[in-house]
Every structure is written in C-alpha cells, then in structure tokens.
Amino acid sequence: MKPFATHPDAIPADLQDVMDRLGSVAIEVATRIARGGIDEDLAGLCGTNTDGDGQKALDVIADDAFRAALEGSAVRFYASEEQEEAVTLNEAGTLALAIDPLDGSSNIDTNLSVGTIFAIWPAAATAETSFLRPGSDLIAGGYIIYGPQVCLMVSFGQGTQKYVLDPGSRSFVLVDRAVKVPPASTEFAINASNYRHWSKPIRAYIDDCVAGTEGPRGRNFNMRWLASLVAETHRILARGGVFLYPRDGRKGYEQGRLRYLYECAPIAFVITQAGGGATDGENPILGQTPARLHARTPFIFGSAEKVARITAYHDLPEQETSALFGNRGLFRS
C-alpha cells in the first residue's frame, strides 16, 4: 500500500508520487529511530556538514535515503542541509525540493522528538534560480515529526493538513484537513541562556512576558524550549504561542542560526497557511529571497497576534525598548 493511498484526493496529482516517496522513507526512518541502539548507534558523530555543524549517523542515513528515493521522480533539483551544493536528480523533472533530512538530531540520544522538514518549488532552469527565490513561491511545504506518534503536517497552498501514521497499515491517515494555529496562548519558546546577546526589542518582549501579572501584559506566561524545530512547531500548531530564534550579538549569529531554505521557509508556509504568522522579527519570512543555499535568517513564528506584537516592539523608539515596561508606547491607552 502506498503511504497516502487512503486519501489521494487531498494531495495535488502532480505531487502525489513525490509525497508517496517522502512518506515511504519517513516510515523507514521512523522504524530505524525506534530501533536505535539495538542494531546501530544513530546518535554517534560521523562528520560535519557544510556549515561545520556536527553530523549524527542518522543525519547521513536520512539524507541518503531521501535522495535515493527521489531518483527518477519529478524532482529535478535536490538541495539538502547536509550537502554543500544542490544536485540534479532528473533533467526532465519539474520540481525543486529542499530538505532538512533530520531536524533536531542533537536530541536523538535523549529520545526527544526529531523530524524531517521539506519544501517544494517549481523547478527553474538552474538549481540556483529554483531555490534562491521567495518562500511565497512554494507549492508545498511540510514536516514529519517522529515522536510518540509519527505525524505529517503539510500545506499545498490551500490550508494545512495533518496526517498520522497508522503503524498497522504503514500508511498516513488524514485526520485534519484544515489545521489552525490557536490564536491565544500563554506560552513562548526561546533559549533564554542567550538573553545577554539579544537586541533590545527581543529583550523587552521577553521581559514583559516574564513580568507576568505584575507587568504590562497582566498575565503569567510559561517558557518552553526543546531545541527541536519540528517539536516546537508541532506544539504551536496544537496549543498556540510563539517561537523565537532571533539574531544576536555573537559571531555567527548575526542572522540567526536557522536556514531559510531547509527550515524557515517550509515551517513559515505551514504556519501561515494555518492562520499564524512568521517573520524575521520585522518582515514576513515568505517575502524574503535567500542569497545562497545555506543562508540563515532570524525566525519568529506562531499565533498571528503574538508575532505582530513582537514586530511592534521593533517599531518602538530605542528609548522606549530601553525603558521600564510601564513607559512603553505599545501599552499606552
């Protein structure tokens, strides 16, 4: 049985085969993750990728598997976070696919959720022109999360769908055709250990959340941080809230750490199609054009009102983001 045989009408016909191939590999990756430590050490370091990040064995296994599965498909160009350059899979192909084969691999040995993130554009004449374009040109984007359940969240530009893997039939079952980001939540996700490196608007926003009922927001907030983008995204789609990975003052973090092609564009696509918001703190993510395959960007996404509020902090005069929260124009009546 093909992975999406039970709901063929939910996937555009020209993407059905590619989605089946992605789904088949995801099922095998999920099985290997479940057996990790029995047959092989999936968490062992086996090298570094093009940006110098350590590669776990499962990073390489997943990348090889997805690339091999897409040979002979409609995918003309394949760009992976684990590879320096894009490769041509099919000269006659009509699609360009970017992928983070195993997001959150630093969590493998702790048994936290990891995932696969993918983005699909129409193929252009070259790999460069296919991928170095705005996220608004996407025709599909999504992620697979390998957790207590294996789920696929995907958008084809007409809302966001949720599929759950049925282990018995080894197929993905469509459980929600119109996922929506809850508009209200008291949760935010950020790595607070980097507070001293953040810009003033980001500090001001977090300060106001931490101030709780005694601050201008008048309510208590909870902080979350999993260091797994797919897990953070999945929680926000279920419960609302906001995720922040801003730029900061450290060397190499001037544009954040998340990659536009492989992480930010597809996640922003899923979130905005579900009624949420996604920016770099000031401008919409999907309106940006990356300068190179592995370009990074600050990334803030979640419930639309919360993302808009963070953007408003960036619009305040500097003296107000430096002032005590009670004096900020954002909260004046």
Curated annotation (Swiss-Prot):
Its cofactor is Mg(2+). It comes from the Bacteria. It is an enzyme of class 3 (hydrolase). Mg(2+) 1 binds at residues 81, 100, 102. It is found in: Cytoplasm. Keywords: Calvin cycle, Carbohydrate metabolism, Cytoplasm, Hydrolase, Magnesium, Metal-binding. GO terms for biological process: fructose 1,6-bisphosphate metabolic process; fructose 6-phosphate metabolic process; fructose metabolic process; gluconeogenesis; reductive pentose-phosphate cycle; sucrose biosynthetic process. Substrate binds at residues 103-106, 191. Pathway: Carbohydrate biosynthesis; Calvin cycle. The keyword rRNA-binding does not apply. Belongs to the FBPase class 1 family. HAMAP family: FBPase_class1. This is Fructose-1,6-bisphosphatase class 1 1. It comes from Cereibacter sphaeroides (strain ATCC 17025 / ATH 2.4.3).
